[in-house]
């Protein structure tokens, strides 16, 4: 791709300074940076919560939290909601999406800059509401799924669950507004000559994700609003004594909840495609197949939601359909895995930190995918449902998969964002500590699940003690790795070497590498022309 660009030095024009620059910012780069900082902060908080309940689970007896099992449930709930809505989505979709989509398509900014500002700032009150809910009336001990009747006014009297519901309303609104912005930007603001099928795969992944958010989030909003009125205004959507059905809530929640796991992982797929192509010095293998796989994953993700509900009493035909549909998702996912491997095959591969995290992602995601095939079988799921086998499965895919893509993207683009290049040896140490830590945490949970240990239980028989101790040690290592990552960020900002325009060489051929590091405040005011 021959790229001609006009590097304008208007950095200082119309740039507000101090706190106003960040509070009132309509610049996509500033907002992307704020999303990433917010995500790192929320991720540390959510990680500390998980460390607390892993310490509780390290030994049987329930002594660490002093037998306060409501607190245990609140920690479980807060950990999940923070990691999904306040860590991984703001990092991948909000942070990298906002910062790099305009750069990758040659746009001067996002289509609706002020909408972009409110999309970010809605997250802050949402996070405060969620944190505050933990200190009100014992906190929301419902799990992130908020199932009634546990989340009903009889199961949780007081304002805690209502605050959590309003928190989800705000974060959902933030996501929907951000999605509208990104869709309009991608369709209307591409540089001349950049057709849809010339866009980098990261842009495609954000586009598909944005459509998923717009289709899925309102369903969650409707479900939790119905729960809110059940709790406060006497409706009986989910109360059996008034003709309602709590299983209806599960259908509504998981109709959002299953697309949500693809909302979390799809931007990561895009990042991995960019990174593997760059460090294999080859174009991505099967570009159109990769695009098609993402679109198919997005579509099929909407029609398999009840595989989360195999034990609620679905009809035999429904079990067959949802089992088959879930297994079919393995096909487009397999296309992506094999295309990444084919891209590396025969390439001039180097292994800097972003590439290590991408390869680590492929390994972890494949393990999680294999256990997903096992869980998709409704007969086997009767045994494994709500055990630690499920916890291991979704952490290997949604959590470790998405987390490793976030780290890959961060190390890949950190020099471009900050103008400082991280020390390679520190990044590689971070990768290996994280890789060992997360596998030590979650791999033993497969064995616990197969042995029958249920999820969300603060105490357990001594037979499960060994693997739980291993898992808790792994959680400590993983948390240490996360804090080490924060150290690397600050160390790089203070002592890092200046990053060249393109630190990665010939393989990095997308538009952002034609700009300075960091890019000027206003970029592509004259659109670049994309030629074959």
Curated annotation (Swiss-Prot):
Its EC number is 7.1.1.9. Fe(II)-heme a binds at residues 79, 395. It comes from the Bacteria. GO terms for molecular function: cytochrome-c oxidase activity; heme binding; metal ion binding. GO terms for cellular component: plasma membrane; respiratory chain complex IV. One of its GO terms (biological process) is respiratory electron transport chain. Cu cation binds at residues 258, 262, 307-308. Pathway: Energy metabolism; oxidative phosphorylation. Belongs to the heme-copper respiratory oxidase family. Cytochrome c oxidase is the component of the respiratory chain that catalyzes the reduction of oxygen to water. Subunits 1-3 form the functional core of the enzyme complex. CO I is the catalytic subunit of the enzyme. Electrons originating in cytochrome c are transferred via the copper A center of subunit 2 and heme A of subunit 1 to the bimetallic center formed by heme A3 and copper B. This is Probable cytochrome c oxidase subunit 1. The gene is ctaD.
């Amino acid at each position: 791709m021959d790229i001609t660009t006009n590097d304008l030095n208007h950095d200082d024009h119309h740039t507000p300074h101090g706190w106003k620059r960040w509070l009132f910012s309509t610049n996509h780069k500033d907002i992307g940076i704020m999303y990433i900082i917010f995500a790192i902060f929320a991720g540390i908080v959510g990680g500390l919560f998980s460390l607390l309940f892993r310490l509780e689970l390290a030994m049987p007896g329930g002594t660490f939290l002093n037998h306060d099992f409501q607190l245990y449930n609140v920690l479980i709930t807060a950990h999940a909601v923070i990691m999904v809505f306040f860590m991984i989505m703001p990092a991948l979709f909000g942070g990298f999406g906002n910062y790099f989509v305009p750069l990758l398509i040659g746009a001067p900014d996002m289509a609706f800059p002020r909408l972009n500002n409110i999309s970010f700032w809605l997250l802050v009150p949402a996070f405060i509401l969620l944190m505050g809910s933990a200190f009100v009336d014992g906190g929301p001990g419902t799990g992130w799924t908020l199932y009634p009747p546990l989340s009903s006014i009889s199961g949780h009297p007081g304002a805690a669950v209502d605050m959590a519901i309003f928190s989800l309303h705000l974060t959902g609104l933030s996501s929907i507004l951000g999605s509208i912005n990104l869709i309009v930007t991608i369709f209307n603001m591409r540089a001349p000559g950049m057709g849809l099928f010339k866009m980098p795969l990261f842009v495609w992944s954000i586009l598909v994700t944005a459509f998923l958010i717009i289709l899925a989030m309102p369903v969650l909003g409707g479900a939790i609003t119905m729960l809110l009125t059940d709790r406060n205004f006497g409706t009986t959507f989910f109360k059996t004594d008034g003709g309602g059905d709590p299983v209806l809530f599960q259908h509504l929640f998981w109709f959002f909840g299953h697309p949500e796991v693809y909302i979390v992982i799809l931007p990561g797929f895009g990042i991995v495609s960019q990174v593997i192509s760059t460090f294999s010095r080859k174009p991505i293998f099967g570009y159109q197949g990769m695009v098609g796989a993402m679109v198919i994953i997005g579509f099929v993700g909407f029609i398999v939601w009840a595989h989360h509900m195999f034990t609620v009493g679905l009809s035999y035909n429904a079990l067959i359909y949802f089992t088959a549909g879930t297994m079919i998702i393995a096909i487009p996912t397999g296309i992506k895995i094999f295309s990444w491997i084919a891209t590396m095959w025969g390439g001039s591969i180097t292994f800097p930190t972003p590439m290590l995290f991408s390869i680590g992602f492929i390994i972890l995601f494949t393990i999680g995918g294999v256990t997903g095939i096992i869980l998709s079988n409704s007969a086997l799921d009767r045994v494994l449902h709500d055990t630690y086998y499920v916890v291991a499965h979704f952490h290997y895919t949604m959590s470790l998969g998405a987390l490793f893509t976030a780290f890959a993207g961060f190390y890949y683009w950190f020099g471009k964002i900050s103008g400082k290049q991280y020390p390679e040896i520190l990044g590689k140490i971070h990768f290996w500590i994280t890789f060992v830590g997360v596998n030590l945490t979650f791999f033993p949970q497969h064995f616990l699940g197969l042995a029958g240990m249920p999820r969300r239980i603060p105490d357990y028989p001594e037979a499960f003690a060994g693997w739980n101790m291993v898992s808790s040690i792994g959680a400590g290592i993983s948390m240490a790795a996360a804090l080490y990552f924060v150290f690397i960020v600050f160390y790089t900002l203070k002592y890092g070497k200046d990053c060249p325009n393109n630190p990665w060489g010939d393989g990095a051929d997308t538009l952002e590498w034609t700009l300075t590091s960091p890019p000027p405040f206003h970029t592509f005011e004259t659109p670049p022309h994309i030629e074959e």
